């Protein structure tokens, strides 16, 4: 009996119902709530698990390299990146029959294969990999790193190698290590790789371990570095006629500021990127030497924060007390990390398509669409997680005495003002945007499209013009040829940048009009509403006017009985749960907008987006319905084609999504009654009644059923859109 799951909670292990299993799974990672947990063991467990996480990441990336080297067509893709379709891996058992085998045999392969839409081919090509042997070498190296990570994780669980709590709470050393050791050194190492391997490869020179000590990355070697003539490294860059991967039109520069894109690959100049990483490395190496550790010099974080008291007195005691609050709360630290990472991930999505870093990826439209959508969804989940852990911080870790009258306390003191302002902004955006869309819908329906309300986004156009886009005729800042900003950059990066901004073959500063104005405000509605729900959930996590003692009920209580006017749907968990639906909704609008605008751009019929995006029926008919037609034809009475797998996934995604509602729109009593009936029938059925179970079956709790419903809703939603996105894009552009 002592060994029953969960081992970390004796109370749960002795529960006679199936609740034991579900609650066990739900709290498996909530180390703080486990029996016998100490602060020291908590930190040590989390630290050791990080190595396991790294091991999984290295193993996964190793697998990518290995499968492409084994079953892909990297070497033939390298010969013609624009016309050969990159293969991810083989398909052992294509469904169904000979037509499937024929449909999936492509990309020059001998048998059925999956096409890669992840951009790894372009990435590996850009950083200097050229052969399958290179890929195998990389796979083995990452496998080695994975093994090292596992050993390190195991090692740090051994008594002799377990770090102490004081080591984990040494904020200055950790900052220095992460800034200099991780960001600084890795950026410097990456600059080294770009200069020594990637840039020579882009010029047709193959540098590997056997010759990298003999090949000078720059004709003058380290001379210019030591003599202070750093500008020599920027002289003689690749010409605009340079053929990537060959010496034709190649230069000798290694660190440049050309601006814009390489004309052939439509990606950023490699020498610009090397320069960028060197600058980042320098900044972070300096930043990592700013905090006081063993030598008694530099900043103390506590002193810095305690000194941050705005003199006007309008923020009370400012940042006093924050050092200990943050340093002693893992949830606060995780919340900050997730908020930062979420924003960065969304920025990655925005920059990967507008400023492509990898050669030829801009012309691989399906990959562009897949990467944008992937990173925006990931960002959404990470950002909602930030608020969830912020709420848990307020419930478990926040001390009013430690934070008296500082910025945290003042946030809680005027939470009504924050929440009501967000609510007002959301209502304003929602009613006005929907009002405009619906008005336009009605005008179209009654055959008077000229009566639509179409608003030009003049402020956004002005901002684009300030960055050098000339088509709007604003003549301001970088789009004004006689301004100081224009003249200052004329000799370095500006010509390349202006050329890129004003050329219509890329995604940098797309021309915008009334359709963009409307969908921008629809997205703003989604962002503000999601934020409203999350912020309210976190700020009310300790208590609200209705339920001042909410803190005592924890993070995820369902209700507090019928008293107080009914307290269902007000726990911090409920806010997170509702916010995820809004987050998915918002990212749906974001990705619909991005995808439709780009499909029309790539097909050369931008007027379709411009004309149809100003009313809801246009979105439903000319984006969703029109682009799902090929998808629905993956299987038809005449057979099947290579889109069949996406057609199946589209259907399956809808099924999973719809299953979510079974958990979301029904209450416990129904399930409990059903379970009792099934258990009764089971116990009275010959043969079946030979199988017994220890735990009495009980229905999921309200919170658990909601989680299961939310998981199905999210997974189904994403599967459905992923299939639609990839099939509709690859069906058009291959």
Swiss-Prot record:
Co-factor binding details: P700 is a chlorophyll a/chlorophyll a' dimer, A0 is one or more chlorophyll a, A1 is one or both phylloquinones and FX is a shared 4Fe-4S iron-sulfur center.
UniProt membrane topology term: Multi-pass membrane protein
GO biological process: photosynthesis
Catalytic activity, as annotated: reduced [plastocyanin] + hnu + oxidized [2Fe-2S]-[ferredoxin] = oxidized [plastocyanin] + reduced [2Fe-2S]-[ferredoxin]
Superkingdom classification of source: Eukaryota
Binding residue positions for chlorophyll a B3: 662, 670
Annotated localization: Plastid, Chloroplast thylakoid membrane
Cellular component GO terms held in the UniProt record: chloroplast thylakoid membrane; photosystem I
Function statement: PsaA and PsaB bind P700, the primary electron donor of photosystem I (PSI), as well as the electron acceptors A0, A1 and FX. PSI is a plastocyanin-ferredoxin oxidoreductase, converting photonic excitation into a charge separation, which transfers an electron from the donor P700 chlorophyll pair to the spectroscopically characterized acceptors A0, A1, FX, FA and FB in turn. Oxidized P700 is reduced on the lumenal side of the thylakoid membrane by plastocyanin.
Protein name: Photosystem I P700 chlorophyll a apoprotein A2
Organism: Panax ginseng
Gene coding for it: psaB
């Amino acid at each position: 009996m002592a060994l029953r799951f969960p081992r970390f909670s004796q109370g749960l292990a002795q529960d006679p119902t199936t609740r034991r299993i579900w609650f066990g799974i739900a709290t498996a990672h909530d180390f703080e709530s486990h029996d016998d947990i100490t602060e020291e063991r908590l930190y040590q467990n989390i630290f050791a698990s990080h190595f396991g996480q790294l091991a999984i990441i290295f193993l996964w990336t190793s697998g990518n390299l290995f499968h492409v080297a084994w079953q892909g067509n990297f070497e033939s893709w390298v010969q013609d990146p624009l016309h050969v379709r990159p293969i991810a891996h083989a398909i052992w058992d294509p469904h169904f029959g000979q037509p499937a085998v024929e449909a999936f045999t492509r990309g020059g392969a001998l048998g059925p294969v999956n096409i890669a839409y992840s951009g790894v081919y372009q990435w590996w090509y850009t950083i200097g990999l050229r052969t399958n042997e290179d890929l195998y070498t990389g796979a083995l190296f990452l496998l080695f790193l994975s093994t090292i990570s596992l050993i390190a994780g195991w090692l740090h669980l051994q008594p002799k190698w377990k770090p102490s709590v004081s080591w984990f709470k040494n904020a200055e050393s950790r900052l220095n290590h992460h800034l200099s050791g991780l960001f600084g050194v890795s950026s410097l190492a990456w600059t080294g790789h770009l200069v020594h391997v990637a840039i020579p490869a882009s010029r047709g020179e193959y540098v590997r371990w056997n010759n990298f000590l003999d090949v000078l990355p720059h004709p003058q070697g380290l001379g210019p570095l030591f003599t202070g003539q750093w500008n020599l490294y920027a002289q003689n860059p690749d010409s605009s006629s340079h053929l990537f991967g060959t010496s034709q039109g190649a230069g000798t520069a290694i660190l440049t500021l050309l601006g814009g894109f390489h004309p052939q690959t439509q990606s950023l100049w490699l020498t610009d990127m090397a320069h960028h990483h060197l600058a980042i490395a320098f900044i972070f190496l300096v930043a990592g030497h700013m905090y006081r550790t063993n030598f008694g010099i530099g900043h103390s974080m506590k002193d810095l924060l305690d000194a941050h008291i705005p003199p006007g007195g309008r923020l009370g005691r400012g940042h006093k007390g924050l050092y200990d609050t943050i340093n002693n709360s893992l949830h606060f630290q995780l919340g900050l990390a997730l908020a930062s990472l979420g924003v960065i991930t969304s920025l990655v999505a925005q920059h990967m398509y507008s400023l492509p870093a990898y050669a030829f990826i801009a012309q691989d439209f399906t990959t562009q669409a897949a990467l944008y959508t992937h990173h925006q969804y990931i960002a959404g989940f990470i950002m909602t997680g930030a608020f969830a852990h912020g709420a848990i911080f307020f419930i478990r870790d926040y001390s009013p005495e430690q934070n008296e009258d500082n910025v945290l306390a003042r946030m809680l003191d005027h939470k009504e003002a924050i929440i009501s302002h967000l609510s007002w902004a959301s209502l304003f955006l929602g009613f006005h945007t929907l009002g405009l869309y619906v008005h336009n819908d009605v005008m179209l329906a009654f055959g008077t499209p000229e009566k639509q309300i179409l608003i030009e986004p003049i402020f956004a156009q002005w901002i684009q013009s300030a960055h050098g886009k000339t088509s709007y005729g604003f003549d301001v800042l970088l789009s004004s040829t006689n301004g100081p900003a224009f003249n200052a950059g004329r000799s370095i990066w500006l010509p390349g940048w202006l050329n890129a901004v004003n050329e219509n073959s890329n995604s940098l500063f797309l021309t915008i009009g009334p359709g963009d104005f409307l969908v921008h405000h629809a997205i703003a509605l989604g962002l503000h509403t999601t934020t409203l729900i999350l912020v309210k959930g976190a700020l009310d996590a300790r208590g609200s006017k209705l339920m001042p003692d909410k803190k005592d009920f924890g993070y995820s209580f369902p209700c507090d009985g019928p008293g107080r006017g009914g307290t269902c749907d007000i726990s911090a968990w409920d806010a997170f749960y509702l916010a995820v639906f809004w987050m998915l909704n918002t990212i749906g609008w974001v990705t619909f907008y991005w995808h439709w605008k780009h499909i029309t751009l790539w097909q050369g019929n931008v007027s379709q987006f411009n004309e149809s995006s100003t009313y809801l029926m246009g979105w439903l008919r000319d984006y969703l319905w029109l682009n799902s037609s090929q998808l629905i034809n993956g299987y038809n009475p005449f057979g099947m084609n290579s889109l069949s797998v996406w057609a199946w996934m589209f259907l399956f995604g809808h099924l999973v999504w719809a299953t979510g509602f079974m958990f979301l729109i029904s209450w416990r009593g129904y399930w409990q009654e059903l379970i009792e009936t099934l258990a009764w029938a089971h116990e009275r059925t010959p043969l079946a009644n030979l199988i017994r179970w220890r735990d009495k079956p009980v229905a999921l709790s309200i919170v658990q059923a909601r989680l299961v419903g939310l998981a199905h809703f999210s997974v189904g939603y994403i599967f459905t859109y992923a299939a639609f996105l990839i099939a509709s894009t690859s069906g058009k552009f291959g």
